[in-house]
Amino acid sequence: MSGARTVSTPTPPQTGGGVEPQANGETPQVAVIVRSDDRSQGAIIGGRPGLPGPEHSPSESQPSSPSPTPSPPPILEPGSEPNLAVLSLPGDTMTSGMIQMPVEEPAPISREAGEPYCLSPEPTPLAEPILEVEVTLSKPVPVSEFSSSPIQVLTPLASHKMEIHEPNGVVPSEDLEPEVESSPELAPPPPPACLSESPVPIAPTTQPEELLNGAPSPPAVDLSPVCEPEDQAKEDTASATPPAVPSATPATAPPATSPAQEEEGEEEEEEEEGEAGAAESDKGGEDLHPTESTPVPGHLPQNVEAVAATQVAVSVPKRRRKIKELNKKEAVGDLLDAFKEVNPAVPEVENQPPAGNNPTPESEGSSGPSRPEEADETWDAKEDKIHNAENIQPGEQKYEYKSDQWRPLNLEEKKRYDREFLLGFQFIFCQYAEAGGLPHISDVVLEKANKTPLRPLDPSRLSGINCGPDFTPSFANLGRPALSSRGPPRGGPGGELPRGAAGLGPRRSLQPRPPKGARKLIASVIMTEDIKLNKAEKAWKPSSKRTAADKDRGEEDADGSKTQDLFRRVRSILNKLTPQMFQQLMKQVTQLAIDTEGASKGSLTSSLRRPFQNPTSQWPSQHVPLPHGAESATTEKPTVTVNFRKLLLNRCQKEFEKDKDDDEVFEKKQKEMDEAATAEERERLKEELEEARDIARRCSLGNIKFIGELFKLKMLTEAIMHDCVVKLLRHDEESLEFLCRLLTTIGKDLDFEKAKPRMDQYFNQMEKIIKEKKTSSRIRFMLQDVLDLRQSNWVPRRGDQGPKTIDQIHKEAEMEEHREHIKVQQLMAKGSDKRRGGPPGPPISRGLPLVDDGGWNTVPISKGSRPIDTSRLTKITKPGSIDSNNQLFAPGGRLSWGKGSSGSGAKPSDAASEVSRPATSTLNRFSALQQAVPTESTDNRRVVQRSSLSRERGGKAGEPRRRLERSERGGDRGDRLDRARTPATKRSFSKEVEERSRERPSQPEGLRKAASLTEDRDRGRDAAKREAALPPVSCAKAALSEEELEKKSKAIIEEYLHLNDMKEAVQCVQELASPSLLFIFVRHGIESTLERSAIARERMGQLLHQLLCAGHLSTAQYYQGLYEILELAEDMEIDIPHVWLYLAELVTPIMQEGGVPMGELFREITKHLRPLGKAASLLLEILRLLCKSKGPKKVAYCGVRLGSAGKNFCLEGQDVGAFITEQKVEYTLGEESEAPGQRALSSEELSRQLEKVLKEGSSNQRVFDWIEANLSEQQIASNTLVRALMTAVCYSAIIFETPLRVDVAVLKGDRICYRNTCVIAEGAARLYALQALVVTLEQPANLLRMFFDALYDEDVVKEEAFYSWESSKDPAEQQGKGVALKSVTAFFKWLREVEEEESDHN
């Protein structure tokens, strides 16, 4: 560093003495105290620790001549041995143990006063940083003082400055004992003595130097200023030489010092002190008397006294004395000296090695004075000290100034200071005063600043080290290197490690090693200790880090994180709430652990937020997931439980009765608004008041609606609802609005026979309020709407427009698409009729009862121009409204104008006309003209009938209608056809039969039977044509939307369950004329009766069975409606535990005669319920009901075989046998000996089995169940079953009389056609089976023709199948083929004529 460092740095805690500092900041005196109880670690010569050596006797020390360099007092460190207070003077030890060090060859250093002598004494190995003391003496001291005065002498100093620095800037707190080492063998060195090795100073201050000669002589003190050493580069480049050990010489002969030794001393001084120190040492104060102010302890031996006396006699050279006197005259002091503090007594040095582990005999034998004796000073010494204090003169410059800077010798320059100069004062003003009452904790409360080196360091070698003042506690500096130890590293006796073979190379480390035996008090924290912290028993933990054990122990924080987590789950469920997800989410709510009163109330608040805050929303209040049966413990009494239902009702009651509280709040806000000072404040309060009123009104409205829904769920009684109505029936508009909402919700359930008087009173009061007109028109209209709703039997004008499920939306989209498709077809049909030209429709068919959009109908009115009132459609088709006997236009009740138009003059009677008017007014007015059939030839009529029927069969669109028409024919089919047929048709038909019989007079009786069969067949065709004339009515009814159909379905079901009129209900369903939407009727029928009585469910099942038997309801529609219920059955099980039993009661009647096959029904149920694991639940309930009605054996024989099909109903991995045994349905296993089982049967054997079943009078359902139970899937899918079933059915239809006849009733398509009849191959297979049967019967005359006619009329075999059989050349089917073709020639001729007529017509 630069030379701008303070000459001395005082240590504030040790500043003492009664002498005040001078104006220039210098300290007049330095107290050097040596205490008898202080433990010394060795004498320090010139800031160096003493060396241990062998024992010497006092006789070995010889007096020597005075030395020009005084010896500074040795410095001792406390903490060493307490007996070593007396100075130990080594004799030959200093010669043998100290004068051994490598000699370096430094560059010569120029000095102003000439080249001084540089002695090369042996450096002392250093254990710690060396304390540096600068002593400036003013006058000699008498020799007698050396022997009598104690060590503790406060000598006045003229320019005496002593500074002691410790490692890391820590100043010791105790005094050190200075010791003076002397030896008679040491010769006095030249005046400008230099140390060969000195420690690196820590602070920018001048340091005292001690010069030791090779010969044993008293130590000399160099009072020249000490500066910072040079860079380490010089030290690295220096070379070491073997040390020179001088021999003992007389005291008067100074030793000869070689130039190498002088250069070595200079180099070592430069390394330790710096170039600035060398410059200052030349300025003055180099040679002073060593005895001017250096006290010598009285306990020193006589040789030391002699040495001191000799030193007094030594005179300083004249040149140096003149320089000193000149400095005393010229130096006026530094202005900054005023800021210097009083130099305290010499502090002790920490971590100094003990003063020799082997004390010398001198130290052991000598008896030092005790501490009280230290205070005994001579009056002479005291006067000298006072005199020195009064006559202190300014010495050399303590600071190094630049040429252009202000300094005491150049006062005219500007006062400019650079950074380095100012940093030299950083530790001068450091005073630390402890606050009172604090405990003494040295590691926390600092007493001294940590003085780190301020010299420029090499950043590459000391990177990352803080060079500023470090106030960090000592325990935090565990990993940092000690930067304050600047002494050379310890090595061998020479004190320095060898640097390679030639002594070259970089240093190993900047940190010196501690000496052997040195005691260090290191305050450190052992990091490996297991420090136990205070741990709370129930410490708070975040919810994410809580373990299951913590939750089980109930370790919850104060804010109730468990309850908060429950509320979050409830809110999460409510956010996902939709009508479709309601049942699933309701199940989740019931699984929540709502076991405390707080949890119950919080869950209730969250659940009621939506219905209370949004009363006008379309979300129904009954879809609020509430665990009605949950119970929880109260807060005050844990043993008492509170029901969730009770909390819910109390909450609703409180909300209903809080009008007074709200009024008080509103009055208070109104008062604040009136008292508002500014208009802005008044406007703000007004908005707040309106908002509060709106919120309160919405909450009350939502509460009213919710109360009504609770009443519907039977959670509130009628008496409570009547009380609510009475309270709301007041004249304020808000209450009346709530009343209207409540009556709209519960009016239907509250208005029954017993409560009618009270309801009349309510509505009379409402009428009175309307008439008074004291309320607003809005409220009056609301009241009037409620009155109209009661008059319409609580049927709203608009249905509940609640939220729809995704499935409902999809269905509505499909229905809309279907309606658009129907409109397109109708437009295309109308366009085709217009393109034909002339009167619409074929001319030959005008006489037939075919009524369509064209023809004689009036011009159709589109839906867009005028809406259709569908409620009037039921009046048209009511029983009795359409009666063919009432449609009379002529006498006799006949529908021909023969008599009236033939000129007979007969007119219809008035009564007949009056009767006919109501009937004709509701029908097509031109239908009477179309009813008249002209008397034509029988052949032409027959051709027309065949042509019309074949044309219908030719198109695919007519196929479903034929199936529906065929299934609609009941047992009274012949009677209805006879009534609908005109007499002219009957006469023409009988005439045809007579002509045919005359043409074939020789034919046997069997042919006459066939003719009668043909007559019946023609009747069937006529009936089919008449029934085909009904589409105009169905077209009008097909326009019914899904919502309208659902409304009508509700009305039909309610009426049927109330009146139990099966015939009326079937007729109403038929009038709906929406076969593609009847699944809505099925769904609503099952859903509406699911929670009613068992009788209601049984009646609903019978109605659906009757609709299936009559053909009004298809199996596909029934399954579709059933599927929608089964999808929700699992969720319904939560609210309806016996839902599977109730579904079984609704489904079981379907499996009766003419309904759905049992096996097919079970398969369809399994498709949807097996994934849910609920198929077995419904199946077992159905089997139990069947056993009650039919018995176990009959159920088993009907085809229920769980032994083979039980895997479809059981869960995966469940044993079927164990399941059957557990559920006690062993009867379903059946008797394996009686049934052939599912094995391959031949055609003959299969036919015999089927004939056996048919002879028992089994129904179609029984036959199908037997097929499914006894045949494998491969046999069912093959033509073997088709031929066997055809053979068995046709054989059972033959009446074995003479001649053979055919029972047409047995040949119905629903018995023969086990599968789809539209497959041509199956139709040909049936004809082959019939051919084989006829061959077996030896070709009875006309039998095959009768079968062909019956099969054609019943639509069992299609026309294509007939042609395929005719043209077949299969060799396996040629037996009896020729005779069969001959017998049916007339049939094929007639069939081709019909097709030719149709082609000509088109």
From Swiss-Prot:
> Where does the protein end up?
Cytoplasm; Nucleus; Cytoplasm, Stress granule
Report the residues modified as Phosphothreonine. Answer: T11, T27, T452, T1014
Q: Where is the composition biased (Polar residues)?
A: 602-621, 918-937
Q: Does the keyword RNA-binding apply?
A: yes
Report biased composition (Acidic residues) as residue ranges.
Answer: 261-275
In what way is this protein post-translationally modified? Answer: Phosphorylated at multiple sites in vivo. Phosphorylation at Ser-988 by PRKCA induces binding to MKNK1.
Q: Which residues carry this modification: N6-acetyllysine?
A: K899
- Which residue stretches does the UniProt record annotate as biased composition, category Pro residues? 65-76
Instruction: Report the residues modified as Omega-N-methylarginine.
Output: R490, R499, R836, R846
User: Which PANTHER family does this UniProt record tie to the protein?
Assistant: EUKARYOTIC TRANSLATION INITIATION FACTOR 4 GAMMA (PTHR23253), EUKARYOTIC TRANSLATION INITIATION FACTOR 4 GAMMA 1 (PTHR23253:SF10)
Query: What is the protein name given in its UniProt record?
Result: Eukaryotic translation initiation factor 4 gamma 1
Q: Which organism is it from?
A: Oryctolagus cuniculus (Rabbit)
Designated gene of the protein: EIF4G1
